[in-house]
Amino acid sequence: YLEKQNVEMDSQRPQRFCENETINNVLRVYEAKAKAANIRFNANAAARKETPVSSHDLVAILANVVENALHGAADSETSEPVISVDIYYKAKKMVIVCENSCHPSLEFVPDMSRELWGVGIHSIVSTAEKYGGTCRFTAQNGVFKATVAFTS
């Protein structure tokens, strides 16, 4: 009986992706949105409690990245759309990488003119640049990839 209760309680606890509550909250919201849209959602976050970016700006970046991924995956025309988010530290940088299914005809190359970017990408880039961060966006073979890095 107790084992069954523990399993039930564990299944009702909100997913905890990392030590950072802002990141946890954003990922939980988009995990639920992806599930509602029948999009597989995977997230691995090794973010620390404190990040080099304010909570407000972290939400602006991460929510825009994952919101774009949600729309891209929904429009991908694949039978099994997916979104994968990885947050980790490498070479004294905090890195956010988001990959999602996208329409196979979508082309997005690193040297693409900024005039062709949408509002979400402009917001991601301007917020990242505020912290000396860098961004890279690509789309190849039905996969869109957004990478944002900040000095930690």
Model-predicted segments: where are they?
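Conserved ATP-binding N-box helix of the HATPase_c
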Residues: 55-78, 130
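Short beta-to-alpha transition helix within the HATPase_c
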Residues: 3-7, 18-35
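Short beta-strand/loop element within the Bergerat-fold HATPase_c
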Residues: 80-92
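Glycine-rich/acidic phosphate-handling loop/turn and adjacent ATP-lid/helix
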Residues: 90-122, 149-151
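Heptad-repeat coiled-coil segments of the DHp/HisKA dimerization-phosphoacceptor module
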Residues: 43-49, 89, 100-102, 139
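Glycine-rich ATP-binding loops of the HATPase_c
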Residues: 132-145
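Conserved short strand/loop->alpha-helix "switch" segment adjacent to the catalytic nucleotide/phosphoryl-transfer site
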Residues: 15, 40-62
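Conserved glycine-/histidine-rich ATP-lid loop and adjacent helix of the Bergerat-fold HATPase_c
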Residues: 123-133
